[in-house]
Swiss-Prot record:
It comes from the Bacteria. InterPro entries: PRibTrfase_dom, PRTase-like, Upp_B, UPRTase/APRTase, Ura_phspho_trans. Its cofactor is Mg(2+). It is an enzyme of class 2 (transferase). This is Uracil phosphoribosyltransferase. Allosterically activated by GTP. PANTHER family: ADENINE PHOSPHORIBOSYLTRANSFERASE, URACIL PHOSPHORIBOSYLTRANSFERASE, CHLOROPLASTIC. It comes from Bacillus cereus (strain ATCC 14579 / DSM 31 / CCUG 7414 / JCM 2152 / NBRC 15305 / NCIMB 9373 / NCTC 2599 / NRRL B-3711).
Length: 209
């Protein structure tokens, strides 16, 4: 079973308070999501392998460490996942960015893939799937399916807010995928919204309704 990591860092929790607040406007909401994604990236990349290299400082030669050539891919789920990309790229500018687009079938209510564009070397790359909200878990699970069908083997899921129901779905369908969240909320309501949640992340990021 994949592990669930919930980040309790004070800076993250402080910023999530204002992400949740309905009075936070589009500009501030967008900046806060960017900042939280960047802070979460510190933890989600903690297991990146390192290697020793020789350098010369202004004082002497030294043996120090760099990331050992790991290929990373960020996969935002359209459209809300886009709001998390830049915050991570600030720390990992060499990461490649793909996209997965899904819509919900009005009859079956199941997510349907309509767009997938991935970086090269899929089988050799570590992927981080990005979505601010993990509600029912259907979209995240299907996005992970899309990656696996194309050869991806190392996948993590990163969300800002998650419902227990969504976590359970992803863990059951993808027991090999670890989930990283900034907040684990109480539940889903009868309409499938996370409670207390933060509303519709896509609408709040892009100023739409």
């Amino acid at each position: 079973m994949g592990k669930l990591y919930v980040f309790d860092h004070p800076l993250i929790q402080h910023k999530i308070t204002y992400i949740r607040d309905k009075n936070t406007g589009t500009k501030d909401f967008r900046e806060l999501v960017d900042e939280v994604a960047s802070l979460m990236a510190f933890e989600i990349t903690r297991d990146l392998p390192l290697k020793d290299i020789e350098i010369e400082t202004p004082v002497s030669k030294a043996t120090t460490k760099v990331i050992a050539g790991k290929k990373l891919g960020l996969i935002p789920i359209l459209r809300a996942g886009l709001g998390m990309v830049d915050g991570i790229l600030k720390l990992i500018p060499a990461a490649k960015v793909g996209h997965v687009g899904l819509y919900r079938d009005p009859k079956t209510l199941q997510p349907v893939e309509y767009y997938v564009k991935l970086p090269t070397d899929v089988e050799e790359r570590d992927f981080i799937v990005l979505d601010p909200m993990l509600a029912t878990g259907g979209s995240a699970a299907e996005a992970i399916n899309s990656l696996k069908k194309r050869g991806a083997k190392q996948i993590k899921l990163m969300c800002i807010v998650a419902a227990p129901e969504g976590v359970k779905v992803v863990q059951e369908e993808h027991p090999d995928v670890d989930i990283y969240v900034a907040a684990l909320d109480e539940k889903l309501n009868d309409h499938g919204y996370v409670v207390p949640g933060l509303g519709d992340a896509g609408d709040r990021l892009f100023g739409t309704k």
